[in-house]
Structure formats: structure tokens, C-alpha cells
From Swiss-Prot:
Top-rank EC class of the record's enzyme: isomerase
Catalytic site: H97, E145
Name this polypeptide is given: Triosephosphate isomerase
NCBIfam families, alphabetized: PRK04302.1, tim
Reactions mediated catalytically: D-glyceraldehyde 3-phosphate = dihydroxyacetone phosphate
Similarity annotation: Belongs to the triosephosphate isomerase family.
Organism of provenance: Methanobacterium bryantii
Function according to Swiss-Prot or TrEMBL: Involved in the gluconeogenesis. Catalyzes stereospecifically the conversion of dihydroxyacetone phosphate (DHAP) to D-glyceraldehyde-3-phosphate (G3P).
Subunit relationships: Homotetramer; dimer of dimers.
GO molecular function: triose-phosphate isomerase activity
Taxonomic lineage from the root: Archaea, Methanobacteriati, Methanobacteriota, Methanomada group, Methanobacteria
Major localization listed first in the record, in broad terms: cytoplasm
Classification via InterPro entries: Aldolase_TIM (IPR013785), TIM_sf (IPR035990), Triosephosphate_isomerase (IPR000652), Triosephosphate_isomerase_arc (IPR022891)
Pfam families: TIM (PF00121)
Amino acids binding substrate: N13, F14, K15, I150, G185, A206, S207
Amino acid sequence: MNEIKETPIVILNFKTYLESTGENALKLAKGSEMVAEETGVNIMVHPQYADIYRIAHEVNIPVLAQHIDTIDAGGHTGSILPECVKEAGAVGTLINHSERRVELFEIDAAIKKADSLGLSTVVCTNNIETSSAAATLNPDFVAIEPPELIGSGIPVSKPEPEIVEKTVESIHNINPEVRVLCGAGISTGDDLKAAIDLGSEGVLLASGIILADDPKKALLDLVSKI
């Protein structure tokens, strides 16, 4: 469970790797909790839906869903009911990840639905323009992630630092309440420090930690320079 604290923020997306499924997911979440307790960094995890309930009831860090569908309870077989992820113990959700894109009107509907349930929202975007549009919808977070860098090991802060800086500036001009995160290619302490130096409040990452030989050690390295 648990509320989302102040910066710095590390959001660990479990995606659908076997390394972050079932027992592995629980182990990863507990390791994340240990790092959060040892360092004071606000670490949040996004497990797969079937793992939310167990993880949310066994760790004391925020657990969020990877997606919600903008549906009401009823005949929607296979859909992700927002009330269900809340009942399972999630305190928020990703929206519009590059691997689960939705239309702008769906982003708007998902934010409003999440707000009505008290779920925090992290909207993923791919450029400055999309980030600015998302900011008008009043999410809690916008995470800028150029899709070509996701999983590349090349952090956006290196080839395109201006994207982060201009996204932060644009969003804060539109809606200063929205907190900006940086994603794509993040894996080291230098990457996180650079993201914060560019004006973001934290990072969204996955494979750099999930697929590491020692995920806990990788997380400790990630937060070592802030």
C-alpha cells in the first residue's frame, strides 16, 4: 500500500518479464522495499495484475497497476476494472505506456476514473507536445519516455537532455501541480542524478533493474548518487 511521498521518486515497472512474475515479483518487490527503507528514496512498483494483491499486502511501499481500462463494472470480460486494482491494494496506475498506448480521450477518462477512486496517475508520454497535452488533464505525474530509447540502456538525459528540460518547463507553465518523471534507458546512479539535475523529480524504469544479475544491488547503485 502506502502513500506516494516526496522526491526523489523511482518507479519500477515489472512489465511481463518472467523475472518479475509470481514469486520473482514478490522477491523483487521486497528487495525494492529494503532499498527504500535503507536509503529513504521513494520506490514504487508496478507488478502484473495477478500479482498486485499479494505484493500490496506483503510490502510497505506503493504498489501501482500497469494500466486500467475506462469501463464501469459489468460485462467487460478481459478488461481491467479500476475498482478491481484498487480493491487489490494498488494506490495508482500507469496510463498510456508506450507498450499500451491509448487515445487522448481515453487518457482523460482514465485520469478522471482514477481520481474518483483515489488512485494516483502516472501518464507516459513520448515528446514535449504530448507531455503538454497530458498536463492539461491534471494527472499526478507525467513521465517523458522517447520510445526509441526504451530498453536501450541509453538514458534520454544523454542524447536528448533538452527533451527533459523543455518538458519540465512546458508542463510547469501549463500545470505546476504536475510532477515530471524521466524514463527510457535509465539504469545507473548517474542516469538518475542526471534526470534530477535536468529538473525531473525521479525516473520510471524496468529492464535495467528487472534483468540485472542482482536487482537489489542495481537499485542501490541507482540511488547512490542522490
